[in-house]
Amino acid sequence: MYKAYRFRLYLNDSQRILIHKTFGCARFVYNYFLDKCKKVGYIKAYDMCKELKGLYEEYPFLKEVDSCSLRCSIFNLDDSYSNFFAKRSGYPCFKNKFSKQSYRTNCIRSTYKGTNYSNIAIFKKDNQIKLPKLGLVNIKGYRNLKSINGRIINATIERECTGKYYVSVIVEEVEIVKSKKIPTSIVGIDLGVKDLVITSEGKKYSNPKELLKREKQLKRLQKKLSRQVKGSKNYAKTKIRIARVHSKIRNSRKHNIINIVNDIVKSNDIIVSENLNVKGMSKNHNLAKSIIDASFNMICNMLKWKTTIQGKYYYQVDTFYPSSKTCSRCGTKTDITNNLSVRKWTCENCGNENDRDINASINIMFEGLKIHYKTI
């Protein structure tokens, strides 16, 4: 099983300069071979790697950076062409220095006189990571580095718009997935905008609406940016301030979702949610911003991953299942809930008073139970 660990890098001046050189060289190699492919046609990655050796003489500055990062840049281009040929994406584009700055390098192992060496290594005791050409770099990101055990595959170094540097390390670990156990509890969850998650037990997790909280601050900074001279130092400073606000929104949202998911998975063996069509829902311009801010897909993906690791069950009911229209007691359907302002309604058949969201989550739970019995 592959796991990714992300750390913040604390660089000295020489390391920072070398990272920016590597960004530029990796981008140069990518654009050089993309331009050649456009002129003469698609070239295989192996042939491009052979030609790369000749570029060192023509462009001596390429010798200053990690050679593995340049080969990885070639394989990234090859992946872009593979996606294009498979019609998963458009034709590869040239990279510029104003877009995301990153490069990837592979872990290379060797043995000398019975001692194993590796160009990428994590030193848990000192909170440091060894990277090619950069040497030892201080890191921060995990409280317990001792929990990281496995074989390092590669590392991706990136610079965020906020000016911070990060490394993402891919580690191959022994797959420790708990065997499926006999479930003793089940919960259905309904996803919403006002309350982010509503469970069939009646518990509601509020939506902090991180974007709405900082919207005024973003508007003020974006207005300030529009009045500044593009390319000036003040323009760059304001762009960083805007990026930091977006980073705070993203981190706060993710932290809240992690806490909600952990609480739900911890106390339930079967979890059932909706399979929402977020793209279609976002066409409602009155709710689009709130729906995107809620990050429904992140919740579902995290639930799927957590339940798999812990040997529990996760199901999604059909997108068009009428969970809000159906009475959870007698199964009678109604059209009164087509109006989103109706939060509570009384069933005409059995007289049961239904809370819109709790009723939907109960129906989702029952539907998930049917799916569970069909699959076991």
Question: Which residues does each predicted region cover?
Answer:
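Nucleic-acid substrate recognition interfaces
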Residues: 1-376
